[in-house]
Amino acid sequence: MSLEIFWFLPTHGDGHYLGTTQGARAVDHGYLQQIAQAADRLGFGGVLIPTGRSCEDSWLVAASLIPVTQRLKFLVALRPGIISPTVAARQAATLDRLSNGRALFNLVTGGDPDELAGDGLHLSHAERYEASVEFTRIWRRVLEGETVDYAGKHIQVKGAKLLYPPLQQPRPPLYFGGSSEAAQDLAAEQVELYLTWGEPPAAVAEKIAQVREKAARQGRQVRFGIRLHVIVRETSEEAWQAADRLIAHLDDDTIARAQASLARFDSVGQQRMAALHGGSRDNLEVSPNLWAGVGLVRGGAGTALVGDGPTVAARVREYAELGIDTFIFSGYPHLEESYRVAELLFPHLDVQRPAQPEGRGYVSPFGEMVANDILPRQAAQS
């Protein structure tokens, strides 16, 4: 099975280590452009742009990077309750047209009650999912060209319509991740691709089976994706050393404060991530080559695949055999690690790469010449 592999734009910060300013890197537009252009050239299908008050606005970041990339798709956040579904549909159609069909949308209900209250959204977990279902029903229908009247518990619109349609028909695909029962119900009814964070394969298989069954009851099929960090090196020993270095400057106080902050979230997915490590740096390999160290201080995706190229590829294929066809990867720092993933992991996978533009030329497609006129020895193909 051909796999779609995305990268990640770290609009909330980047660096060599977690939980410290040592080795930290300023993230400005120039740096984000470097990462996006690297992902574009290396053959990643797209980039996920995060959302929330700790991040730059995902829509504006995507719009700023469209002109400097050629094939890369941008997965940006839809925020039910923060914006009207009709306005969001107009924005989505515009971004899709301006990007020449490179816009994808990620439904984000939110999981931090404090942040949501600051944004003016005062709904419980259950109410947020009710509102998200209403939002998505309207957003989809408006983008597909309908004139919509809708009277819901949380959202009411009359005569909602779109004058300028999206380029992708009937509309751009909708992605969504959530681990609660309500999230799975929403995914089964409304989205094209259901995302999970990187839990052990058995747990992921269970979630896929649940969503697949719920979707089948509605006469639908849903694709599946997974969000993971990757630490890949030429040898497994080097990869595990890199994992250890990533948290080398983390002290127990920083871990405790991070976990206390994340504990206020009402996100079931966040709770499942935290349960993998229990706030302790002991026994972080929670499944073969699946390392939970990132989640000690990072919210959201908190696990990484660790190993050499063939080993990480084998773990990727294990997830693919469960039905996952889309992998959203990241690594610290994101510029350098995009090259490592492309050079050390891609050769061992059947990667679905965007088509190269016609007429693209290469100065040296083979690496640096030997003694100025001898082609380098061809590497063995795996």
Curated annotation (Swiss-Prot):
| Induction, as annotated | Repressed by sulfate, cysteine, or thiocyanate.
The record's annotation in Pfam families points to: Bac_luciferase
Its UniProt entry gives the catalysed reaction(s) as: an alkanesulfonate + FMNH2 + O2 = an aldehyde + FMN + sulfite + H2O + 2 H(+)
Q: Which UniProt keywords apply?
A: Flavoprotein, FMN, Monooxygenase, Oxidoreductase
Q: Where in the sequence is the signal peptide annotated?
A: none
Q: Which domain of life, per UniProt?
A: Bacteria
Q: Which GO terms describe its molecular function?
A: alkanesulfonate monooxygenase activity
Give an example GO biological process.
Answer: alkanesulfonate catabolic process
The broad enzyme category this protein falls into is oxidoreductase
EC numbers for this chain: 1.14.14.5
Q: Any remaining note in the record?
A: FMNH(2) which is absolutely required for this enzymatic reaction, is provided by SsuE.
The cross-references to NCBIfam families, in alphabetical order and at most eight, read: alk_sulf_monoox, PRK00719.1
Q: What does this protein do?
A: Catalyzes the desulfonation of aliphatic sulfonates.
The family annotation for this protein states:
Belongs to the SsuD family.
PANTHER family under this entry? ALKANESULFONATE MONOOXYGENASE (PTHR42847), ALKANESULFONATE MONOOXYGENASE-RELATED (PTHR42847:SF4)
Q: What is this protein called?
A: Alkanesulfonate monooxygenase
Naturally occurring in which organism (per UniProt): Pseudomonas aeruginosa (strain ATCC 15692 / DSM 22644 / CIP 104116 / JCM 14847 / LMG 12228 / 1C / PRS 101 / PAO1)
Q: Which gene encodes it?
A: ssuD
